[in-house]
């Protein structure tokens, strides 16, 4: 079964749509969504469900659409409007439109969405499987007998936040001040966006 994955191209969104597609054992292709300038600033509930608001068009040949993020709502709705019951639409996160516009919505509990087609999660879904985690279980093997473990999951710069050397120094000095070296072990887990 083929699926089209729609996101804005951010890793956090890609990991969610790919995770669901892999869990459902779907063949999938990813389409990054870019709205035309004017429509970037308009909320989904005010944007017409039309492919004409997209910067680039794409070929659609799937039975399932999995979307994530605000900008992917519109092309998903446009495809549903065109193909009706011939396709099944799934949106991950709060779409900021009526839940009835999708066949299924998967969102974190804290989004407080309610509906017969809403599945609530604790945290975000992702593409790591139990098999992959089990295979890498020794990757972060830590001697817990002697020290308490502090784990820092470190992201990276985005359009709202820049990881400067000054900010990194501040962060690590703060950690060093709070957690003395002799009692704690720091485990830093970088993301693909973490600067070198």
What is each PLM-predicted segment?
Residues 100-164:
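A nucleotide-sugar donor-handling region in carbohydrate enzymes
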Residues 2, 63-64, 88, 104, ...:
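Structural motif
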Residues 58-69:
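Short N-terminal targeting/anchoring amphipathic segment
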Residues 17, 74-88:
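Glycosyltransferases and closely related glycan-assembly transferases
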Residues 181-196:
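Catalytic donor nucleotide-activated moiety binding site of glycosyltransferases and closely related
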Residues 1-53, 60:
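N-terminal pre-catalytic "stem/leader" segment of glycosyltransferase-like enzymes
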Residues 165-173:
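Charged helix-capping and loop-helix junction motifs
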Residues 68, 88-94, 108:
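Short beta-strand elements of ligand-binding domains
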